[in-house]
Amino acid sequence: AFAPADSVATFKLQEYGMPKADIATYSPIPLVIGLFLPAFISSTVAADPISVVRLGIPLKLFTCFLSFLVVQATPAAYAYAAQGIGPSTSFLCGFVGTMILHEISGTLIFMSFMSFFNKVADPAIGGTYMTLLNTISNLGYKWPNSLALFVLPKITTPELDGYTIETMAGFIIGIV
């Protein structure tokens, strides 16, 4: 459900006119938030990790939808880039806000899983069981991104962008 926003959105932003320099300029903002966010949410997550996942997944779905809207607004925002007119402040605020929400929701889900793995891991065998659970979790999280990138050119037609199809399908699957 999250793969188009995680793996395809940045490529689509570039395809629709956003320069790499703009993406690189605003990317450190959520990175800094992501560095300090675990310190603030660790006490909440440790108490009941599953309830935090129930909060994080709808937030991430909402963020994926916002990411889709930002990608769709990019051609209009950069329509006059050749004349030296950049995107509006509201577009850039929406872009950065979406990146921040994406970072928050991803960190919530990641920390919830780590806290859950910590609760179910057997301390007698050390970190082996937790490492196994984390590896399985990472594989489960990464293969949809690879699949989204692989399928994208196959479902893209001149009439309809494959990113739109993937995003809507992922959003529906995420709701179900």
Regions found by a protein language model. Give the residues of each.
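Conserved extracellular-gate-facing transmembrane-helix segments in secondary transporters
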Residues: 1-6
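Loop-to-transmembrane helix entry
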Residues: 9-34
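Loop-to-transmembrane helix entry/capping segments in MFS-fold secondary transporters
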Residues: 20-21, 93, 123-136
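Glycine-rich segments within core transmembrane alpha-helices of 12-TM secondary carriers
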Residues: 27-31, 133-149
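Helix-to-loop junctions at the C-terminal end of transmembrane segments
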Residues: 34-55, 75, 152-153
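A membrane-interface helix-boundary motif in multi-pass transporters
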Residues: 49-52, 150-174
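C-terminal ends and interior cores of transmembrane alpha-helices
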Residues: 59-88
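Hydrophobic core of transmembrane alpha-helices in multi-pass small-molecule transporters
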Residues: 77-116
